[in-house]
């Protein structure tokens, strides 16, 4: 492993500007290629029940954004693939690693319901069960782009890539509603950005940074450290379109946001590694996506380039938790 004394996270880093070469930030190209497809932004909403549902998945696909449908309504997945393909849209689903999930993979393969993207989605992705699932998907559906995770070490990235994964998802418990670090003592919470850097250096295929994104600038920082795509949870939660339940408190509207390993998602208090919080009700998800695109265009202009590749070359400084100068975000 790399030098474990030089870890850092998003709030510890500032990117250093270069000379601007475009006349307007609107000239900057934020598009990214993943597999055989090009998407409008290097950002994907987290595949969580309070972030994405069928309607949001359809909207994102139609608008040219990448999405990953969650796996918590397993019985609807085959119908979801059918509908997306019928509408001429890409199908991107999540699977687990247990026997019933392997049966599902065999079933959709036999029915020629082949999704363009499958994400193998478990909390600790450096596991034999994940490797077996990658190998099964690649044997039955070689053309499907397989994302595997979640992991937090270069060794894990290499092993999943060697098993056939087309991309790896990096992040163990840094998310806002994830309490893995508290419950288990393990994870990338507090050093997620360093983990992204280390894992991306070891990777020969795309890395998706997952968790710990609190501001739009964190997307640019993730790309600087080697991420191709950035998974975002809390920033995409609590919108008008979001599936979470709306709650009124003291005249203000909030929406529920809970983790994928919380008792609220699992329906039982067993092996809980997530919690539920209320977030202030936000406006339209489309507005947030547009704002994120504009902020990323500004990042590209500060990087002195015309597209996302400029962000991968900028210098940065480590300022250890001081970039807010005492201000709240």
Curated annotation (Swiss-Prot):
Keyword tags: NADP, Oxidoreductase
Catalytic residue list: 178
Enzyme class: oxidoreductase
Single Gene Ontology MF annotation: oxidoreductase activity, acting on the CH-CH group of donors
InterPro entries the UniProt entry points to: Aldolase_TIM, Dihydroorotate_DH_CS, GMP_reductase, GuaC_type_2, IMP_DH/GMP_Rdtase_CS, IMP_DH_GMPRt
Catalytic activity: IMP + NH4(+) + NADP(+) = GMP + NADPH + 2 H(+)
Signal peptide: none
GO biological processes: 'de novo' pyrimidine nucleobase biosynthetic process; purine nucleotide metabolic process
Protein name, entry field: GMP reductase
The organism of origin for this protein: Lactococcus lactis subsp. cremoris (strain MG1363)
